[in-house]
Amino acid sequence: AHHGIRDSSTSRGLGDVYERQLQLQLECGGNGRSEFVPAASGNQWTTGAIGCPKFTGVRLRDVLNYCGVARDAVYVGYYGADTHTSGNPDADPISRGVPISKAMERESIIAWAMNGEDIPLQNGFPLRLVCSGWPGSVSGKWLNRLVVRNQVHDGEKMAAPSYSVPQTHVAPGSRVPNEDMKVIESMPVKSIVTFPRSGINQDYRQRMPVRGHAWAGDDQISGVFLSIDFGATWLPTAVGSAANRLSWQSFESWVQFPEPGYYEIWARAMDNLGRSQPMVVPGWNPRGYLNNACHR
């Protein structure tokens, strides 16, 4: 099933294709997992498992096309130099991937630099795959081998329940059979307020500047709105352009508190397809994926 490349013995240097620089979002599929009730299994991320650095590398499609991809290719899988997180040398480390259509996007790259410097070891040095807009687990780190498949890749963590959610909505706490799960692809619309920080005291007579970022998986942001009255009313913000497709977009505005008291600033983003963040944690699932509730 590894017969997607016409000449599997081909060896190429990355200098044979053009270097690219792209600012690309990487978000853990379980970003916001800690907010699910009952608790979902996995690292209890709050809302900070997202970044959007500038990567330097080459387009994955340029490498694949240079090697020659067979017509029956449907999936690209990766293998890294890491070992299983348990430390067991006999256990296979994560080996995920993306459909050939995602691999061939202009923004899918093999990167060796991040923010103008060699990628740090914990971020995948010396090479990592970056397939932005999908769960970060598809962007393999410590990359040492790619396989082009004529079937869906079957590496470690490709099968349910890993990086999968129920095909239909289920009641919180339900047991969901693996055959009733579907793999996560594009991540949902989401936002994060980066200023002000929580817990500050503010003179209510002064305007409070508000800044943050918004992103929408494979799609674009059409607007970001703020509320200081628990979602009763919403104020528009100024949303900047994306540095390139699949980069997050920054927003800024200000709020004026009407009187002294306790306030929360909520942010709610909308994408170009009209989908917006829910005000409560959506779609409970056993592994706690895809929480895109309003940031507050």
Where in the sequence are the language-model features?
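Intrinsically disordered, low-complexity serine/threonine-rich segments
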Residues: 11-14, 31, 194, 260
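Extended, aromatic/histidine-rich regions of cofactor-dependent oxidoreductases associated
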Residues: 19-23, 65-296
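Short, small-residue-biased leader/transition segments that mark boundaries at the very start
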Residues: 1-18
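Metal/cofactor- and membrane transport-associated sequence elements
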Residues: 37, 60, 75-77
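Mid-length scaffold segments of soluble, non-membrane domains
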Residues: 48-62
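Short, conserved helix/loop micro-motifs enriched in His/Cys and acidic residues
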Residues: 19-49
